[in-house]
């Protein structure tokens, strides 16, 4: 993995992203999903995780956020953050690109037209100080 400066050392953002994807995979596997593929990359976008459950193919994008809850005594919502939701980063243009990547995956992998599929989003909140994460799955997002 290379960062913008062509160094082999991953950036902090890349490290958080990798931790988030690993947490998402662990969460999905514990909940009965079978990991089929990871990091399917095209020049127009990427699918972080492809899973299968109940004969349905699920394309999962992971958004990871590093948060510091060390001084927090009261959490006001389930995600631990009132002002920012990572899923807000899913802009219409990004969804359009994801749709194209999914279509590419279906063609590249010769997936039958009869196969049901959906797009899901996993948000991962990572507290590096406490070495904890919170994972949330948003299912069947319309592209």
Question: Which residue stretches match the model-derived regions?
Answer:
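Mg2+/Mn2+-dependent nuclease catalytic core
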Residues: 67-102, 108
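Domain-level recognition of nuclease-like catalytic cores that cleave nucleotide substrates
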Residues: 107-143
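Positively charged, solvent-exposed patches that mediate nucleic-acid binding
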Residues: 52, 73, 80, 112-113, ...
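Short acidic/glycine-enriched loop/turn segments that link adjacent beta-strands
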Residues: 42-45
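Conserved catalytic cores of phosphodiester-cleaving nucleases, focusing on short active-site segments
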Residues: 28, 47-71, 79, 98
């Amino acid at each position: 993995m290379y960062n913008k400066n062509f160094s082999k050392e991953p950036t902090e953002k890349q490290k958080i992203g990798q931790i988030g994807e690993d947490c998402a995979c662990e969460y999905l596997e514990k909940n009965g999903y079978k990991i089929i593929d990871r990091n399917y990359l095209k020049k127009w976008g990427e699918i972080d995780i492809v899973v299968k459950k109940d004969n349905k193919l699920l394309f999962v994008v992971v958004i990871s956020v590093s948060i510091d809850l060390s001084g927090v005594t009261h959490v006001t919502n389930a995600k631990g953050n009132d002002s920012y939701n990572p899923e807000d980063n899913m802009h219409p243009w990004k969804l359009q690109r994801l749709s194209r990547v999914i279509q590419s995956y279906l063609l590249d992998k010769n997936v039958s037209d009869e196969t049901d599929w959906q797009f899901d989003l996993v948000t991962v909140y990572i507290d590096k100080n406490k070495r904890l994460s919170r994972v949330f799955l948003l299912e069947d997002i319309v592209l």
